[in-house]
Amino acid sequence: MDRKIANKWGRFLLLICIGVLACQHLQAQYFGQNKMRYKKLNFKVYDTPHFNLYYYSDNDSLVRWLAKESEVWYELHQQVFQDTFSRKNPVIVYNNHPEFQQTTAISGEISVGTGGVTEAFKQRVVMPIMQINQQTRHVLGHELVHAFQYRVLMEGGDSTRLENVANIPLWMVEGMAEYFSIGKKDAFTSMWMRDAYANQDIPSLKQLTEESYNYFPYRYGQAFWSFIGSTYGDTVIMPLFIETAKYGYEYAMRRVFGYDAQTMSTLWKNTMENTYRSLNKDTTSRPIGISLINSSNAGRMNVSPTISPDGRYVVYLSEQDLFSIDLFLADA
């Protein structure tokens, strides 16, 4: 009897072990899967002094142009970062956005609105060719700023490591990439800042850091760095970046400028208000109409309004009181 019981327990334990191993195997298969790729891309490598450009395009002139622009951006960024690449930086270029979304160089899904990605550990820049050369050049310059940022943190030898990037607010990281790839003056960013001034909603640095969902880091970050560069010069940018990586932006402000982040917020806000207030002097017309749909009587996101033919109603898309977007009707 004891032998039968022992055999039963032995078989039971064997089945448990097989089940556990099978689950682990299935889990490994699930998490080890690559993204769906619809065709094989035969990449080639174009070497430049500082980059390995991976491409599969048959357009030789485009490849040479990308290689040239990469080196141009390197020279520009190197002057500000005061850093050089100890090894060539990989740049992986896709012919279009759908094929870029299938890349396995970056883990995770890539959204339609993502223009490019820079991977942290190897600083691999992954991007598609955009619709026009100006957009492609901008995305390339933006992503190469991130490559420099990662290299400074990992290889700069200034008591920083990659995990120090967690101390740097998103608006500071992305704003710097926009500032170095676009410059001090940008009509698109100015449009955002004029809107913030008109609505009396110029944020403090604390709000930018804690409410990035309300204040787009790219635009507000670029505006802040433009203020810093115009007021103190671009030479203070890297000291502020490094100190922020080591201690956080609030302590970094004190070490670099001698006053706290709230004072810096006030100076930035005053400069913004003075700049856009002067533009209103030539404005004689007043906004026509009243606000029918806003965050107080609808959702936080209200888009695509359409007025009925008789002008009595307006329909719009909103996430009001819902987990997803739906169609709503309001009196006009």
Regions found by a protein language model. Name each.
Residues 310-312:
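Short coil/turn segments that connect the beta-strands within blades of beta-propeller domains
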Residues 53, 171, 176-186, 194-261:
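Active-site-proximal alpha-helical
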Residues 28-163, 169:
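Juxtacatalytic substrate-recognition/specificity segment
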Residues 315-321, 331:
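Beta-strand C-termini and the immediately following turn/loop, strongest in propeller blades
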Residues 1-32:
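Bacterial Sec-dependent N-terminal signal peptides
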